Each structure stands twice: as structure tokens, then as C-alpha cells.
Amino acid sequence: MVGQIAVTASIGFGCAIFMTSLLNLLFDYPNTYHWIYLLYALIMLGAGLINMFKVPITATLNAFSAWWHMIGVLLIVGILIVVPDHHRSVGYVFGKTINNTGFGGGTTSGIVFFYVFLTGLLMAQYTITGYDASAHMSEETHSASIGAAWGMVMSVVVSVIFGFILLVAVTFTVPDDTKAAAAGTFVVTYIWQTSMSTHWAELLLFIAVIAQCFCTIASTTSASRMMFAFSRDRAVPGHQLWHRVSKVDRIPVYTVWGVVVLAFLTPLPAWWFGYVGYAASTAIAVIGLYIAFMLPIILRLRAGDKFERGAWHLGRHYKWIDWIAILWIVFICVVFMLPSYYLGVPWNTGFDWNYVNYTPLPVIGAFLLFGGWYVLSARKWFKGPIRQGTEEELARIEAEYEAPVAAPETA
């Protein structure tokens, strides 16, 4: 749950960064992190309001979002191929290495650069996180035993293909390494504006911002359904409130707004520490989600042949695939909690709190908080998932839904 809320925050905050760039070009909107956070608040508010719509409406938005992403990527790539007067060489795109972390004095070889490379995997790993959304929406999916599984697989495949094409196209148009690095958070805007023109940059940013808004809405939907499911199983503090849904549309209203508020607070360090705070939020999202992904994989290994397979399964290959997945998750969870900037290491000369990777604090804090809660309390009464609830609960819920109502009150 921690990872799902954090990834919602990361997506929304990334959207706010791109939206700030667009508004800065259009209206000279301030591009400081305080103003970015203001936009972020409005984006999360909008995501919450849209998630109040009926399920068929949000499903239509998700379908439109998928087409927007695919067509949008093709448009951006096509424009980046045709419009810029100058493109980088293939050797530059696939062979150029840059180290702006301060480690090793900027070296691009040896063990130091290998360390820099590993910490730089964060954003790549972050992009491969949302595929579990299909599972969260399985109760609202036709033929979920097959559809949800294929949704997870295809989301990764599509992300890899379209994401790689987009990254390569952008890299071919990088005008100047030094100035691009100096642009920091707004590096993409700098690349597009310098390689083409302000108007072209505005168009591409508009496409990207709309796509990110769709992602924020979808992630809010996914996180709210996860929180609702956990609450229904009585696994979340205050579950009596969180598992309630609206009478008319059966929307988990309270979990939607709970996710919105928690996601809004997650990247709060960015208010003071800028991009480093946002990057740490992203690391929390990756670590939290992948630990959650790892737990059922471990349980599958433990079950062995006693495990009852579903309609979609890995067959006899599950063992080696599971071990690779577990080892990789353990590895990245360690790497992404390490310092990513030289100035963020306390004993280094010029140490600056603005460069500290604070990821270990909330990650370890969450383990202590929720682990302690389980040891001291939850293990005494939590009996595992409640798939459908008791017969009495089902009868009461269905009776409430069938009763006529004059307004969409909550139950």
C-alpha cells in the first residue's frame, strides 16, 4: 500500500513538473518547486474528482488514455525525427556516458561509474511498476482470470517498446550535454525548445501532460481499489470507514480521497529539497511496490506443487523465474537506498542536505510501524483475506444497494 500511494504521488508530481514547464512557456508561470507543488495539489484534486465518476466512465477514460499514449508517442517521435535541423549520431545516442553525480570526479569508467550506473537505474525501474493495476481492477474486469493477467504482461511489453522508442528519439535531439545537465528538472523542455522551437516544445509538452494526467487518474483508481480490498479484509487501520462505498455507483469514495490526501503528502520534502525529494519519493514507490510483488512470489515458491494454478500460469518454469525475480528485487531495494550524489554522503566534503537520499527513513519507518503493528496487535486477530465477507454482510450490502435512494449518499 505504501508503494502504491508513493507511485501515485510520483506520477502526479512528475505531471506537475511537465505542466509547470508548459505553463512557463505559455504564461511565464513560475518554475519553482513551491509553485510545482501547488499544481500538484490541483492535479491530485482533479484525479480524486474524476474517480467519483461511474465505473463505465472511468473505464472509457482508461481506454482513451491507452490510445492517447500510443498515438502521442508516435506523434512525438515523428516530430522529433522530422522537425529538428540537427540530430546526434548513433554512436552518441548508444555510446555516450555522463556522470553528473560528483562521484569519482565525473569519471565514466571503473567501479565508481558502475556504482553510478546502478543508482541511475531508478527511473528505468520506476517506469515498470504500473502493470499491477490490472490485478487491482480485476473485480471490475470481464474474464479476469485471463484478462487481468494479460493486461499485466502487455502493459510491460507496450511500455518497453514505446518507452524505448521515445527515449531514443529524445536522445537523438539533445543539443548540448552541459546545458542539458544544467537544465535539471526541466531538461526535456530545454531539449525540445532548443532543438526545435518554443511552439513545438509547447505542443509536445501538451501531449505529455495530458498523458501524465491520465496516468495519475488511473493510478489513483488502482490505489483506491487496493486500499478498499485491504480494508474489506480488515487489514487497514480504520477499515470500518475505508471499505464503505457509495450506494448508487458502488465507488469506494473514502479510499479514493484517502489515497489523494496521502499521495499529496508523500513528496512533501520536495517543497524544501526540490528534485531530490521527488526522486526519493520515486525510490520509495519502487521499493514499496517491488517488496509487495516479491511476497506472493515467495509464497508461490513455498507452496510448490501444492499450489493450485489459475487459468494463466508459468507452468514448470516458475521456479527459475521466481528466483531471478526475488534476487533482482532484493538487489534493487538495496541499491535505491544508497546515496545517489557525492554531496549527499554525510562524511564527504561539501555535504549538503539537499542531496541526501532520505529513502531509507520512510522505508525502514514503514517496516517498523506496520511490522510492529502486526506483531503487537494484528497477528492476534487477522485471519487472512476475506474473499466475499460473511453471508450476513453480503445480504446487508445487497439490500442497501437494492433500496431506492434519492441522492448518491454513502453507506
Regions found by a protein language model. Give the residues of each.
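Hydrophobic transmembrane alpha-helices that form the core helical bundles
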Residues: 1-44, 48-52, 209-226, 277, ...
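TM-loop-TM module centered on a large, flexible mid-protein loop between adjacent transmembrane helices
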Residues: 21-26, 97-108, 151-217, 236-285
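Interfacial loop-to-helix junctions that mark the boundaries of transmembrane helices
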Residues: 26-37, 62-64, 351-359
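Helix-loop-helix junctions that connect adjacent transmembrane segments
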Residues: 28-35, 67-202
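Membrane-interface loop-to-helix entry segments
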Residues: 36-97, 129, 152-157, 282-295, ...
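Transmembrane helix-loop junctions in multi-pass membrane proteins
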Residues: 50-56, 200, 262-281, 302-306, ...
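Hydrophobic alpha-helical transmembrane segments in multi-pass integral membrane proteins
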Residues: 79-81, 325-342
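Terminal cytosolic tails of multi-pass membrane transporters
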Residues: 108, 297-321, 339-411
